[in-house]
């Protein structure tokens, strides 16, 4: 009995099993604090999909402090090449290795006009609006057009296959490089593409300087961020070509 009691006093309690990590690619309704919790386990980043971006923009002004913190968190994630430390009483501390998430959603044209005017009239714009790289602004159509078609099952199947490949393929097998063993892989422009990019970037720079001379500071900021937009679109199109089977691996895989 003495030996048994001694064993019970010194034996360690079994460790609780580690909670499995859920792969997340999309989020909808989440605070910036919860987005941070999700990002710490999402090395590939996530996409915040908003049915109405107007609600997101309005939330920044609902409570001064909370809105300011959320706006700052959104702004900081734009580059997509950094990390982020969170230290909060009650929430503890954690580390986000890949501090990146994109915003995508719909907004009424009238709200776009309002947001643009606010950015233009603000003397200390923080560049939030300019970080929305693409806007689709519909033309007003008075005529009625009925659209009632069955979905194309072949296209839907191909879309699923391409999406799965994008989530699972190894970019290094298709020519992507790494600076360090733990760094994210990257692609380089071909010589022809690099020449075309430099010509475009030179013209972009001229337009940016013209906007600065005319004191069109919001427009200037938007033009300056087009460098990232073109690189991002090039990468997206290239990876879609890979996922569609139009680009083969750089070497044979056994």
Question: What residues fall within each predicted segment?
Answer:
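Phosphate-sensing "switch" segment of ASCE/P-loop ATPases
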Residues: 4-5, 76, 85-86, 92-105, ...
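Conserved ASCE/P-loop NTPase catalytic core
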Residues: 1-103, 107-115
């Amino acid at each position: 009995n003495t030996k048994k009691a001694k064993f019970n006093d010194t034996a360690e309690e079994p460790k609780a099993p580690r909670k499995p990590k859920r792969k997340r690619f999309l989020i909808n309704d989440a605070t910036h604090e919860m987005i941070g919790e999700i990002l710490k386990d999402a090395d590939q980043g996530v996409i915040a999909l908003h049915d109405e971006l107007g609600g997101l923009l309005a939330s920044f002004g609902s409570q001064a402090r909370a809105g300011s913190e959320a706006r700052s968190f959104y702004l900081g994630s734009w580059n997509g090449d950094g990390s982020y430390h969170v230290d909060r009483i009650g929430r503890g501390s954690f580390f986000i290795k890949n501090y990146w998430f994109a915003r995508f959603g719909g907004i009424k044209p009238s709200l776009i006009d309002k947001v643009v005017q606010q950015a233009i009239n603000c003397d200390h714009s923080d560049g939030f609006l300019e970080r929305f790289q693409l806007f689709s602004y519909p033309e007003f159509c008075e005529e009625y057009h009925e659209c009632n078609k069955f979905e194309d099952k072949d296209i839907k199947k191909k879309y699923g296959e391409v999406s799965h490949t994008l989530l699972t393929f190894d970019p290094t097998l298709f020519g992507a490089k790494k600076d360090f063993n733990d760094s994210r892989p990257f692609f380089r422009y071909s010589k022809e593409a690099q020449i075309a990019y430099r010509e475009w970037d030179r013209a972009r720079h001229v337009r940016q300087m013209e906007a600065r001379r005319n004191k069109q500071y919001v427009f200037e900021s938007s033009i300056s961020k087009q460098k990232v937009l073109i690189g991002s679109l090039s990468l997206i199109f290239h990876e879609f070509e890979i996922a569609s089977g139009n680009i083969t691996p750089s070497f044979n895989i056994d």
